[in-house]
Design a protein with these regions (language model features):
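N-terminal binding-site loop/beta-alpha segment at the start of enzyme catalytic domains
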Residues: 1-70
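Conserved, mostly hydrophobic/aromatic
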Residues: 6, 18, 46, 59, ...
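Short, well-ordered coil/turn segments that N-cap beta-strands
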Residues: 11-16, 42-45, 66-70, 97-101, ...
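Active-site mouth loops of central-metabolism enzymes
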Residues: 17-29, 73-85, 109-111
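Structured C-terminal cap/extension of enzyme domains
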Residues: 39, 43-44, 172-186, 190-340
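Short catalytic-loop micro-motif centered on adjacent basic/acidic residues
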Residues: 44-49, 73-74, 134-137, 157-160, ...
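Short hydrophobic/aromatic-enriched beta-strand-loop microsegments
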Residues: 69-72, 155-163, 234-240
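Glycine/proline-rich, positively charged
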Residues: 79-193
C-alpha cells in the first residue's frame, strides 16, 4: 500500500481514492458490496457530493458502522449560507455521520472567502467550529478559480481534473498545492472515459507527489484493477510510457472532457457526449455509438442555435458549437463507412 499525508490536514490517505459519483447507477445492495470491498482492499478515502442523487445514501449505508476506518469527503453546490447549512445537515443525516472530514465547495464560479456577501466561507468556518466538518476544501474546473484558491491560503485541498493528459497549467496547480501545504485530489483520472487502460493511468498517478486520484467505479471489475495496484504497486513500464505518449499525441488539445457543466442545452443536445463523439468512436467499440438512439442524438445537433450558452458555461473555454459541427460531420462519415 502507498499511503500519503494529505496536505497539512494530518489525515493519512491511501494513494488511490474511490469516486462515488458512478454508484448512483447501481442498486444500494450492489453499491454497499462494492464500497465494502474497496475498504477491505485498502482504500480509505471516499468522495461523494450532495449533487450525486443517492450516492451519499449508499455511502452512509455502507459505512455507518465503520466510520473510523474511512476518510469521508463530500460537497455542497450551495450559493448562500442558508443553502450551505441545508446541504450540510442533509449530508450528515444521509451519510449517517456526525462529522465530515473534507467538506468541499462544489465547482463554484468564484473563490469563497471570509466576509463574502454569499456568506459561504463564514458558514464553513462556523461548521468547522461546531465540529461538523474537519477541513474546508474546494473543487473546480476553472484554472483561474483553482489558482486563486491556492493563493488564498484558505483551503485544505483542491480537487481538479487531472490525468496523464495534463498540461503545464495543471501540473503547476499540483506544485502550487504542494508548496502551500494543500492536498490535491485528482478527478477525471481517466479523462472522462477517453483513457482505456486503468493500470497505466494508476501507474502514472502513483508517480505524482501529493496527488490522490479518485477513481470513479461502478463495476467490480473496475475496482479490481485499482485494488491490484494497491496490492502489487503499478510500475510505469516502457510499454505504459508508450501508451501515454500515444494518447497524448491523439488527445491533447481542443477536446471536450465531458464534464457536463454546459448542460442542459436549450436545443436539447447531449453536448457532453456529442461534442466528443469522434474520440469515443475511435476509443471504444464504434458500434455502441452507431445505434438508432445515438443517431437521433447526433441529429439533434442540427437544432443548435449558436446561442453561446454552452461556451459561456464551458470551464475549458472551448468553442463548443464548432466542436459539435465537426463531430456531427465525422459521425455520419463513420456511419456511412460502417454500412459498406
Amino acid at each position: 500500500m502507498q499511503k500519503i499525508e494529505f496536505g497539512s490536514t494530518g489525515l493519512v490517505i491511501e494513494k488511490n481514492g474511490f469516486g462515488c459519483l458512478p454508484i448512483q447507477r447501481i442498486s444500494e445492495t450492489e453499491a454497499v458490496k462494492l464500497l465494502h470491498k474497496a475498504c477491505d482492499g485498502g482504500i480509505n478515502f471516499f468522495d461523494t457530493a450532495r449533487a450525486y442523487s443517492d450516492s451519499e445514501q449508499k455511502v452512509g449505508a455502507a459505512f455507518s458502522g465503520m466510520r473510523d476506518r474511512i476518510v469521508l469527503a463530500t460537497k455542497t453546490g450551495a450559493q448562500t449560507a442558508e443553502g450551505f447549512w441545508r446541504d450540510l445537515e442533509t449530508s450528515l443525516r444521509t451519510l449517517k455521520t456526525d462529522y465530515i472530514d473534507i467538506y468541499q465547495f462544489h465547482n463554484p464560479a468564484f473563490c469563497p472567502k471570509p466576509g463574502g456577501e454569499d456568506g459561504l466561507y463564514d458558514a464553513a468556518l462556523e461548521a468547522k467550529k461546531q465540529g461538523k466538518i474537519r477541513h474546508i476544501s474546494i473543487t473546480n474546473h476553472r484554472l483561474a478559480v483553482a489558482q486563486e484558491a491556492i493563493d488564498s491560503g484558505l483551503y485544505a485541498s483542491l480537487q481538479f481534473p487531472f490525468s496523464y493528459l495534463a498540461g503545464e497549467q495543471e501540473l503547476a496547480l499540483v506544485e502550487g498545492c504542494r508548496t502551500h501545504g494543500m492536498g490535491f485530489i485528482a478527478m477525471k483520472g481517466m479523462a472522462g472515459g477517453l483513457l482505456r487502460d486503468g493500470l497505466t493511468a494508476a501507474a502514472w498517478m502513483a508517480a505524482q507527489e501529493n496527488v490522490v486520484p479518485i477513481w470513479g467505479v461502478q463495476r467490480e471489475s473496475e475496482l479490481d484493477q485499482f485494488l491490484q495496484c494497491i496490492r502489487e504497486g503499478a510500475e510505469l513500464t516502457d510499454e505504459r510510457r508508450t501508451t501515454i505518449e500515444r494518447d497524448r499525441r491523439e488527445l491533447c488539445g481542443e477536446f471536450c472532457r465531458g464534464c457536463g457543466y454546459c448542460m442542459p442545452c436549450p436545443a436539447g443536445i447531449e453536448i457532453n457526449q456529442c461534442a466528443r463523439m469522434s474520440l469515443m468512436l475511435r476509443r471504444a467499440p464504434a458500434q455502441a455509438w452507431l445505434t438508432e438512439e445515438w443517431q437521433a442524438k447526433m441529429h439533434q445537433i442540427e437544432q443548435c442555435r449558436h446561442c453561446g450558452h454552452c461556451m459561456a458555461k464551458c470551464p475549458y473555454g472551448l468553442n463548443t458549437p464548432e466542436l459539435l459541427q465537426a463531430n456531427y460531420k465525422d459521425y455520419w462519415e463513420v456511419l456511412a463507412q460502417s454500412r459498406k
